[in-house]
Amino acid sequence: MKDFVLDASVSLGWLIDDPPSPYAGRVQQLMINGARPLVPIHWHLEVSNALLTAQRRKLLRRDLPEILANINALMPFIETDDLPDDIGTLVGLGQRHQLTAYDAAYTALAARRNVPLATEDAAMISAARSLKISILR
């Protein structure tokens, strides 16, 4: 089983988008085949906020209870890393690579665990490459 860090935007790609992006679909298939996603502690808040925002803006193409059921079905397979990196590390990554603190947390987790990063975010991909972190394809 291969571990990887899962960016919230990728998971939202298969939870909200109908159909999901090709990349989100490939990542979901890797999970079905046994790859284990790792997420930073704020992932749950980021996903929850995105769902609330999408619902308020009437952007959800599926019912929220169906989306929540899909998330709950995934939760046993997602490992939450509850050891946040220190603030200096996150701020430093953010400054050097033009990342938000949230995106720096995903990047730092991938670096610390020495696992690939699943993201389509251009700034995160650029930061990961400069840090020799592989991008899940």
Residue ranges and their predicted role:
Residues P76-P116, E120:
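Active-site neighborhoods of divalent-metal-dependent phosphate/nucleic-acid chemistry enzymes
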Residues H42-L45, Y102:
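Aromatic- and histidine-enriched alpha-helix N-cap/loop-to-helix transition segments
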Residues M1-H42, A54-E66, L131:
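Short, well-structured N-terminal submotif of metal-dependent ribonuclease cores
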Residues L30-I32, A73, D85, G92-R96, ...:
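Long, hydrophilic "mature protein body" segments
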Residues V10, W43, D85, Y106, ...:
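Alpha-helix capping/helix-boundary segments
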Residues S48-I78, T89:
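Active-site-proximal, substrate-binding regions of enzyme catalytic domains
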